[in-house]
Amino acid sequence: MKVQLPVRQAILDRRTYEAPAEGRSDKVRLDFNENTSGCSPAVRRALAKLTVKHLAMYPEYQQPTERLARYFGVRPKELLLTNGGDDALRVFFDTFVEPNTSILICEPTFPMYRYWAEIAGAQVGALRYRANMQFPIAEVLESLRNNLRVLFIANPNNPTGTLIGEKELRCILEVATETVVVMDEAYAEFSDFTALPWIREYPQLFVARTFSKVAGLASLRLGAVIGCADSLALVRRAMPPYPVNLAALVAAAAAIGDPGRMRAYVAEVKRLRVWVAKELCELGVRTYPSAGNFLLADFGPTGPALFRKLEGKGILLRDRSKDMGSGFVRITMGTSEEMRQLLKLIRKEWKPAARVRPLQTN
């Protein structure tokens, strides 16, 4: 039988978002900013205690929400749990964005902002980070005069690693009195900065967080939206009653119950960022200051060939050549052994070429 489905034009106009390739588990995964050292052993112990009865019940949220609110330093009514960080972003479109209304992003950045915007039928305004990967603060402030519904800011930004300072952020919030400001803090733990203390001062501010990075729980899909209680009550209307599964709640509670594990991971990431940047600089590779668990590097025109060689040897990186220029790559800070293995192969396989972009050091 031949039928014609009444598909929305916004869906027809875009391609399917392709998830990472299968078969990554036995590779050196330096491509998606996962915690390759793994979650706390306490998480596995907690998950092992789940019973058939637990699995048969719909999840209950009061106690997990109270515990996670304490972790973030907010009240339970200021916290909304979501099915991963991606879902934390989607709910802003369901709440605030109508077809043909405008949102603003600064690129290169996390692609899901544009993804959800296009599905919602929104008009996407896109500014560019400067050549040195600095945030375009003047252009953002000017754009806020143009009837924007939502401004999305990744802080630190993915993939540049840029951290926007408190002064700049406050300037934005003081101007954005009729615009929702979403601060995506997926990598906040690696930056020593968060806007969470500001949520009661600025009702238009929402902070999105995830347990995929520092807690090492990417497969369980747990995110959070945090904002002042009155504003968050509106967002809550756009959420289903059971957005998060019990296993994710149990795992998150166990992870935050082992803060030493997360602190050690953050300290190791910070150490590796400095060391890897220094080693790459000595090879003539430009890197950019990063406040995330990754580095952005520029290998120039011979970079893509190197990345393919590394993939063939089981080391996965996130090639950003298509949207940033040939040779740009984002490198997750894995374990010390993984980073030594990466640098050893780069020294062996990379053949530098004449540079189109000038080399600068951090």
Feature locations, PLM:
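PLP-dependent aminotransferase class I/II
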Residues: Q204-Y288
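PLP-dependent enzyme catalytic core of the Aspartate aminotransferase-like
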Residues: K167, K309-K313, R318, K322-N362
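Short acidic capping loops at alpha-helix termini that bridge into adjacent secondary structure
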Residues: R75-L79, P99-S102, E185, P203-Q204, ...
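Active-site phosphate-binding strand-loop segment of PLP-dependent enzymes
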Residues: A131-E189
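PLP-dependent aminotransferase-like
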Residues: T95-I153
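N-terminal small-domain helix-loop-helix segment of the aminotransferase-like
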Residues: K2-G84, V91
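Conserved PLP-binding catalytic core of the aspartate aminotransferase-like
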Residues: A131, K270, C281-K313
